[in-house]
Each structure stands twice: as structure tokens, then as C-alpha cells.
């Protein structure tokens, strides 16, 4: 079965390349485009209307609109301006007056993964405890 299909495929390729045109072998019923397809000129026109083309043109930098912050800028006593709702550090600040936690100085007390990153503390053997 596979050899028969391969011979048919070989025959089709030979006829298509050396014989009659493909339109006579497998006629196309509707050669016109059925949907909205754009040719090369329409693609170029659409690209020229886009924002990237305007950025690449010389002298167009002043014409494009600047992105503004949703928050109005507030002037600090130092003279610098920054919006009042600007994102700050994502670190959670420690509450005032709290005592800092002393971390383990002995690095052998931690488990290490294959990338050299610390991922947990080693469990002390129960026999060593009691």
C-alpha cells in the first residue's frame, strides 16, 4: 500500500512539473480571494500609518504624543518632582520599634540546591537532641 501511494505521488509530481499545468489537472473553482486579504502595497500603507514608522522618521519625535502619568507630579522640598502615587519598593517595611531577627551565621545549617541557592534549614537528628 505504501509503495502504491509513493508511486502515485511520484507520478503526480512528474506530471505537475513536466506535463500539463496544474490548473488543468486540478482546476481551481474560485481563484479570487474570498476574504479580506491585503496585498504588498496595502501592507506598506498600513505600516506607514503605524507608530513605529513615525518614530523612525526624522523630525517626527516632536509630533508624537508623550505618555503622561495618571498622577500629577508633586515637587519635593529637595526640588525633585515625582508623582505621589509612584510605586515604591516592593519590600515590606519592618514596623517601627521592632527588633531585627538574628539570622543563622552558620551556613552549614542550611540545605543547598544544585544551583547553590539556600532553600531551608537542616533538620537536627532526633538522636542528637536527646
Swiss-Prot record:
Organism: Rattus norvegicus (Rat)
Record protein name field: Metastasis-suppressor KiSS-1
Function as written in the Swiss-Prot or TrEMBL entry: Metastasis suppressor protein. May regulate events downstream of cell-matrix adhesion, perhaps involving cytoskeletal reorganization. Generates a C-terminally amidated peptide, metastin which functions as the endogenous ligand of the G-protein coupled receptor GPR54. The receptor is also essential for normal gonadotropin-released hormone physiology and for puberty. The hypothalamic KiSS1/GPR54 system is a pivotal factor in central regulation of the gonadotropic axis at puberty and in adulthood.
Biological process per Gene Ontology, one example term: positive regulation of luteinizing hormone secretion
Residues bearing PTM Tyrosine amide: 119
Cleavable signal peptide: 1-19
Database matches in PANTHER family: METASTASIS-SUPPRESSOR KISS-1 (PTHR16955:SF6)
Family (UniProt): Belongs to the KISS1 family.
One Pfam family in the UniProt entry: Kisspeptin
Keyword line: Amidation, Cleavage on pair of basic residues, Disulfide bond, Phosphoprotein, Secreted, Signal
InterPro entries: Metastasis-suppressor_KiSS-1
Disulphide bond pairs: 71-85
Localisation per UniProt entry: Secreted
Origin superkingdom: Eukaryota
Stretch list, region Essential for receptor binding and receptor activation: 110-119
GO cellular component: apical plasma membrane; extracellular space; neuronal cell body
Phosphotyrosine, modified sites: 110
Parts of the chain that traverse the membrane: none
Entry's Gene Ontology molecular function annotations: G protein-coupled receptor binding; kisspeptin receptor binding
Spans annotated as Disordered: 52-91
Tissue expr: Highest levels in the cecum and colon. Moderate levels present in the liver, spleen, kidney, ovary, uterus and small intestine. Low levels in the stomach, pancreas and placenta. Expressed only moderately in the placenta. Persistent expression is detected in hypothalamus throughout postnatal development, with maximum expression levels at puberty in both male and female. Hypothalamic expression is sensitive to neonatal imprinting by estrogen. Expression is higher in the hypothalamus than in the brainstem and spinal cord.
Amino acid at each position: 500500500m505504501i509503495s502504491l501511494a509513493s508511486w502515485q505521488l511520484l507520478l503526480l509530481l512528474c506530471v505537475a512539473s513536466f506535463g500539463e499545468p496544474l490548473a488543468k489537472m486540478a482546476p481551481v473553482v474560485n481563484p479570487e480571494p474570498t476574504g479580506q486579504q491585503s496585498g504588498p502595497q496595502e501592507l506598506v500603507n498600513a505600516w506607514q500609518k503605524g507608530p513605529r514608522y513615525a518614530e523612525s522618521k526624522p523630525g517626527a519625535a516632536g509630533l508624537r504624543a508623550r505618555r503622561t502619568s495618571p498622577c500629577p507630579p508633586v515637587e519635593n522640598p529637595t526640588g525633585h518632582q515625582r508623582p505621589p502615587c509612584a510605586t515604591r519598593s516592593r519590600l515590606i517595611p519592618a514596623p517601627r520599634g521592632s527588633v531585627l531577627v538574628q539570622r543563622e551565621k552558620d551556613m552549614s545549617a542550611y540545605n543547598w540546591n544544585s544551583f547553590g541557592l539556600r532553600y531551608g534549614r537542616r533538620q537536627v537528628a532526633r538522636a542528637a537532641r536527646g
